[in-house]
Amino acid sequence: MVHAAVLLVATACLAVFGVMLIMNKRRHIAQWTYLMIPLTLAEGLLSLALQGLGVNLIGPAIQLVVLIALHVTADPSLREERRLQFALRRMDARSAYEDAASQGMAGRDLTGKGYISLDFFNLFWLFAIGCVFGLVIETIYHFILFGEYQDRAGFLWGPFSPIYGFGVVIVTVLLNHLWQSNWLLIFCSSAVIGGAFEYFTSWFMQAAFGIRAWDYTGQWLSIDGRTSGKYMFFWGVLGLVWVKLILPRLLRLIQRIPWKIRYSLTLVCFILIFVDGVMTLMALDAWYSRMAGVAQNSPVSQFFATYFNDDFMAHRFQTMKIDPSTAGRM
């Protein structure tokens, strides 16, 4: 039902978008891409959850690439921004950065509307650091609570828990304009955002791969066992501490990455984490297929069965319990 609704909305928006392309309304085209890109991402995630990894994702992937290309090329202000950025790189990009750094404004939103500049460089490093420190905090919390160490990583390789990385990015983006607001508003907003994100993540993992990584059934304000009042409270506290205390200090730390290597280092790290994420999704899909009794005849499935077999997956993802019968695939 949800997938059908998203497809219906996306199709209607795509029709309007096509008319705008024909009429060459560049400014409106650029604005509509802000709506179409999230819809396309939602369509792709729902398709992955309900049908798994396959040719069903080719359409959303191509559409996403086209939308991003149109977004960048259709908006005259973005073209002007690219020209300006190119000129700055040629003339005085470094001096401009050093000037901003000397005023304590490196990485900041210079418009004053938000605290942090929501550019790729900042958001990527917030994601990466959130993945690592989120894993550390959760591991310590589990050890204190149960007196045992448990590997709570969410990627095939590295000390990464992507739910915290994405959580950090989502909270940062949605609360960026509230950084000067009172603590109660930030706390409540973060609690709702975190709870909704946790619910969706739990639903997606179960629908796509039959995996439950947590179950809060029986807790206060439990919603299908996917989130609860207790953990929404934790999200609220973490969001408040993040916006008021951690983000300003972390931004200053990120901006200390040397100018000469910051973009090359970011690109290399992004590629490594992106490959890690894609391989993780493929390994989870192969794990689901094996547990569901699907024949592993393709070279790809045989590769994952050899190098990322059931024992490896169970040991690596110790918090995950897989039951293909609970998946929502069609």
Residue ranges and their predicted role:
Residues V2-M330:
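Aromatic-rich, lipid-facing transmembrane alpha helices and their immediate juxtamembrane interface loops
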